[in-house]
Amino acid sequence: MSGQGPPSNLTPQQQHMIMQQQQQQQMMRQQQIQQQQLHQRQLQQQQAQQSYQRSRTPQMQQHPGGGSPGSHLQMHPHLQSQGHMQPRSPLVGQHHPAPGSIPPGNPATPQMMQQQMGMNQPMSLPAPHVSRPGSVAPPASVPPNMHTGPSSNQMDQMGGQSQYSHHLQPQQPLSRPGSQQSHIAGGHGGPHSVQQPGSVLAPGSIQQPGSLLAPGSMHQPGSVQQPGSLGAPLSHTGAGGPQSVQGYGPGSVQPPGSAQAPSSVQPGSTFAPGSLQAPASQQPPASIQPPPSAASGSVAGPASAAPAKVEPLKPNEEQIRMVQDPVDLVRNLVQKDLRMSVVEMNKRGAELLHQKEEGAIKEEDRQQYKRATNDFHAVCDEIDRTLTTIMETAKQITKLDKVFQDRTSKEIDGEAMVNSVQKFVDETGIVQKMFDDTVNSVTSTMEKMRRRQKKWKDQQQQQENAEDAEMAE
């Protein structure tokens, strides 16, 4: 079957299945060859490890006269042969051993290696595929700093260009249609996992987890295809650089119709531009949202800035006084408001005295004198309130300084600190009570004054009505 192409009368999906089976058989043969190489390498490492352990273990033997008892232990590691110096793979670090490597002091048997390779196998692999070539220990030509991921990830970064043609094949055997694919939960090769000419990817290896979906990732036809994406050839250019692959076919990165469906979208992962996606997910809302949001933001900018162009209300005199320095406020009140109010009050009073001497006092001049007198009293009250605020603030600052005195030179224990703060809080409460009493007194006075004014107006209205009634009679 591997030497013949699929019949032309088959549907694209059937042709895809036939090509997958052919590629699967090729990968099985490659896996058998790599397993044999693995066994040979394991035997060599095991022999080297046993020899290394024997050279490091003291032996109970008779020493000839004149020789030191520990002369047979004087062989240093730097004097041994190169085979004894490499009991482990160069990629196996001290704290990050590769899954397929043999740790020192614990030689593994072929059965144990088969068990380890079986554990590294994806869940979607069929039963005959027991081992994965991804668990093969990397060669000694790889630098020691390339051991950050699983062994299959290490193999993605090493090797030569001899197996570069395998990158065009699916990365893992096809499982039954409808079964869940462990590639979804396993790993996804990003654009960086598309192998460069100097890298080799073993068939069936799992890409690095958390990375972007690579063009080389393979998905099940039953779980990733949609009816609308099975017919037309979907040839997309990968965005991974010169190493990316275009089109599809027997050696393409993705089979025809293997569009990425929404059901296989991994949480927290994004798709590379070269990955094929379903028509419903080729243009996700997230890729369309930024331009409208930017446009709407630019449109909403002038609209939101329009209210700022409206001229703000000018603050009244009371608001200006609240944000001023109290000392400056008192100075302005004394130098300007107080003087003007005194002059105005004296002027109105002089006019009333002149009219009184003449014997005819105008009601309008009397009201103006009352208004000038009220203004003078208001200025005096404002000065008194501001000076009181300044003095009370100075007292509070002095009390607060006593609470934190000598704090920079020495630490105050908890009890003394609580006592000082409690005293300050009590004194602050007394001042607050004084303010509350003053406000309540002013409020009650204003209420009484308004009630009296209303009562006086009612009496005046009744008198006018009575006078009108008498005149009418």
From Swiss-Prot:
Transcription in keyword set: yes
Bias type Low complexity, positions: 13-50, 111-123, 130-139, 272-286, 294-308
Coiled coil: none
Positions of region (Disordered): 1-319, 444-473
Pfam families in alphabetical order: Med29
Biased composition (Polar residues): 1-12, 51-62, 148-183, 255-269
Chief place of localization: nucleus
Localization in the cell: Nucleus
Entry function: Component of the Mediator complex, a coactivator involved in the regulated transcription of nearly all RNA polymerase II-dependent genes. Mediator functions as a bridge to convey information from gene-specific regulatory proteins to the basal RNA polymerase II transcription machinery. Mediator is recruited to promoters by direct interactions with regulatory proteins and serves as a scaffold for the assembly of a functional preinitiation complex with RNA polymerase II and the general transcription factors.
Protein name in the entry: Mediator of RNA polymerase II transcription subunit 29
Source taxonomy: Eukaryota, Metazoa, Ecdysozoa, Nematoda, Chromadorea
